[in-house]
From Swiss-Prot:
Record organism: Natranaerobius thermophilus (strain ATCC BAA-1301 / DSM 18059 / JW/NM-WN-LF)
Annotated family: Belongs to the BshC family.
EC number: 6.-.-.-
Gene: bshC
Function, as annotated: Involved in bacillithiol (BSH) biosynthesis. May catalyze the last step of the pathway, the addition of cysteine to glucosamine malate (GlcN-Mal) to generate BSH.
Name listed for the protein in its UniProt record: Putative cysteine ligase BshC
């Protein structure tokens, strides 16, 4: 029996991430609160209460905006009851987020939501308050190559890649119409998944949600609400006009800060580097923290003094011009990776943010920005990681006495051990030793028979050759069986590797929840939700 939890190692995350999980003290100066102390959540809740008392919230506008936004995707009363809870000044949120993706994107996006749900329930109980999980869809992002793909594995163990293409260079994901191309992808994917027991149910759902969507952001929101609406999950797409309008104070403050924003990032990054860590965020020089939409293109807005520049286009803008445009049309502005966390924690009563490994690294660079905007950084809580273990893969692991930890930590050594154990003998040596022994006995036998007639020696060599041929035949049969075992072992090991640790990446980064839903129905989500909350280990989830 193998381990049901696996510890992260240096191949699975940066040193910042590993220390955040297992050795927090060296990082405590870069975060306001530790995720490993229950008192951190109490402190953040108290800060949110003080903020509420100072009326620095937008609950009425937020709930109205959320109500109108969700109407497009769902009529689930649980969703609207949850939205109404946000009107209560004591209601808090656990936020997580990710770029939209095909059928929600890689598994880790789903794991973020699962973690947020479980953490919300735990904090609701511990703090005796309503805590709501919210998924922030990073629809502003314009790196389409990060989200335009889906991977699966065929029955031969070959990884298959499905992609949608779009030639709108520089356009935000939330501005790209992908409906027809995504339906084409689903049609191609059908050839791979159509024999799965729950294929019809889930492909109907994916097609239905796509039909009511235009962009990947809408499709992602629709699927998330289908999967987790009953768990109280809400979704925010910051590109929608109501949320852009509410974002104006943050955008305005960024314009006022000018060079101060990227200076604070540089300062915090230098401190991080001096502690022996590497920063995750590598910004363009003089980045203002904002992007500006020009004819649909999301262009970085750099700043020098009071002069701003659309960096990719060479267009200059004065601060006064930008302030006027922000007031009249906030949809022209978009936050960069350093500003969107501040924005979401400005809009929402964020008790905690569920972050992936890379996000934790760049949150370590953001403390001064939070201070500049006078917004408290919430508890940064690591998202959970899972290994979904299918029955065919489990059988292979048991057959060769391998655990997932062997695949993660010492795969070359494990492979050698398996093949060594497959061949407990050297057939050539066994044949030679056996022939030597038989030859000796054969000579004695001939010698005894020669007492009857010495002509028997005439048959000695031919007779032994016949014996040798039979022994050699058996040896060749043994080699044939071994080669067959080797070939099967090769296939088995390659298959288990590409399912568990494809291309030396965690499963969660390569595969999609859709395949598992088609195979195992919603039981896969139920198992994840029942798994005890533990972001410090990779939990092995048996799907049998």
């Amino acid at each position: 029996m193998f381990q049901n939890e696996v510890t992260f190692n240096e191949d699975m995350g940066s040193q910042v991430y590993l220390d955040y999980l297992y050795n927090f003290d060296p990082l405590k100066d870069f975060f306001e609160l530790s995720p490993w102390q229950e008192s951190s959540f109490e402190k953040q809740a108290k800060k949110l209460q003080e903020r509420e008392a100072n009326r620095r919230t937008f609950r009425n506008q937020l709930t109205l905006g959320l109500h109108n936004y969700h109407k497009k995707f769902t009529d689930n009363p649980k969703v609207y009851n949850t939205i109404e809870l946000l009107n209560d000044p004591e209601t808090m949120t656990v936020v997580t987020g990710q770029q939209p993706g095909i059928m929600t994107g890689p598994l880790f996006a789903i794991y973020k939501i699962i973690t947020a749900i479980k953490l919300s329930k735990k904090l609701s109980k511990n703090l005796d308050a309503n805590v709501i999980p919210i998924f922030w869809i990073c629809s502003d992002d314009h790196d389409f190559q990060e989200v335009n793909w889906l991977k699966t594995v065929d029955h031969k163990g070959e990884q298959l890649l499905y992609e949608i293409h779009d030639d709108k260079e520089g356009f935000s994901i939330g501005d790209r119409d992908i409906k027809h191309k995504s339906q084409d992808l689903l049609d191609k994917l059908a050839q791979q998944l159509q024999d799965s027991p729950y294929y019809d149910k889930w492909m109907t759902l994916f097609s239905k949600t796509l039909e009511q969507s235009k962009t990947l952001a809408d499709w992602t929101a629709a699927i998330i609400l289908e999967l987790f609406g009953n768990e109280g999950v809400l979704v925010i797409d910051p590109m929608k006009p109501v949320f852009r309008q509410l974002s104006k104070p943050i955008f305005s403050k960024a314009l006022d800060l000018g060079e101060g924003l990227h200076n604070s990032i540089d300062s915090q990054t230098e401190k991080l580097n001096n502690r022996g860590y590497s920063g995750q965020v590598d910004l363009r020089v003089n980045h203002s923290g904002l992007f500006y939409y020009y004819q649909g293109i999301r262009s970085p807005l750099t700043v020098e003094g009071d002069q701003f520049l659309l960096a990719n286009l060479g267009i200059e803008k004065s601060k006064e011009d930008l302030v006027r445009e922000l007031e009249s049309d906030p949809a022209k502005f978009s936050p960069n990776v350093t500003l969107w966390p501040v924005l979401q924690d400005f809009l929402l009563p964020s008790l905690a943010y569920v972050a992936g490994p890379g996000e934790i690294s760049y949150f370590a660079q953001l403390k001064q920005i939070y201070e500049q905007f006078e917004i408290g950084m919430p508890v940064i809580y690591p998202r959970e990681s899972y290994l979904l273990l299918e029955s065919d893969v489990k059988s292979i692991l048991e057959k060769y006495q391998i655990g997932p930890e062997n695949i993660f930590y010492d795969w070359p050594t494990t492979r050698k051990r398996v093949f060594r154990e497959l061949a407990p003998i050297n057939t050539e040596k066994v044949l030679n030793d056996t022939c030597r022994t038989i030859k000796e006995e054969h000579e004695k036998f001939i010698q005894e028979l020669s007492r009857l007639d010495e002509k028997i020696y005439d048959f000695e060599e031919k007779n032994f050759h016949l014996i040798y041929r039979q022994l050699y035949y058996l040896k060749e049969k043994g080699d044939q069986y071994f080669r067959r075992q080797q070939l099967q072992a090769q296939r088995d090991l390659d298959y288990s590797k590409i399912k568990i640790y494809p291309l030396d990446k965690l499963q969660e980064r390569e595969y999609n929840i859709g395949e598992f839903l088609c195979k195992y129905d919603s039981s896969v989500l139920k198992k994840l939700l029942k798994t005890p909350l533990n972001p410090q280990k990779i939990s092995v989830v048996d799907l049998e």
